[in-house]
Amino acid sequence: FTGILFLFTVIPSRFAAPASDTAEPPVATETATLPAETATSTTAEPAGRADLCENYQMLDITSGKVEELSVRDYVIGAVCAEMPATFEPEALKAQAVAAHTYAERQHLLEQSHPTAELCGADFSNDSSQYQACFTENQARQYYGDNFEASYAKITAAVDEVLPYVLEYDGTPIIAAFCSMSAGTTESAETVWGSKVEYLVPVESEADTSAPRYLETASFTGEEFQAAVQDALPDAVWDTDMAKWVQVGACSQSGTVLEVTVGGKACS
């Protein structure tokens, strides 16, 4: 086979969080999406609130203990885990507001609809369920020799916007986010199957000029077949490699909803 080039768009799916203070910290990512509540429903709404929290309760899944941490420490830890410190200060501030909003909404949800497994906490440090949040020790491990400068930069950004959260009709929003779009954001209905009034497509043309907006990977025919063999053992490979991957349905925002690989529909 001759060489063949495929372009893939990666859609992030979940938040990632460190499991404990002693665990190896995860790699901070540039993308993350829906909070845990939306894994089961996008219609649940927390009760209203009078004031923002001063402290959150976090369940350590390793020790089983519920630990209290200040909102400031939580938001700093969340930004450390969710966004590289090399990003511009305004981006770090935006991430801080999103992280704070997520935590505030989750706190209110637990007040009105407690999750038994959380033992009274607002969330846990389970990386598969809740927003990422480094402890200071984990941030030190992750940033290494760059810790002091990185931590100071993130802390300064957090302090500037700590009083703020994003609300819709007086309730903290579902603060879903990703690193970038393909020039237009996607609707919640397309992603989750349920409408969210404020999560609708909007133009985001600046994304198309962002670093790492487009990445390519090259494979030979044999390499591509081997890569998808386990997932699609019954795939049929046409002699014309241009027919191996066919894009089917797309959303109005341009998100690929269905693709055919080796004659097999994937969605």
Q: What name fits each language-model region?
A:
Residues F1-S267:
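Conserved, single-site charged/polar hotspot
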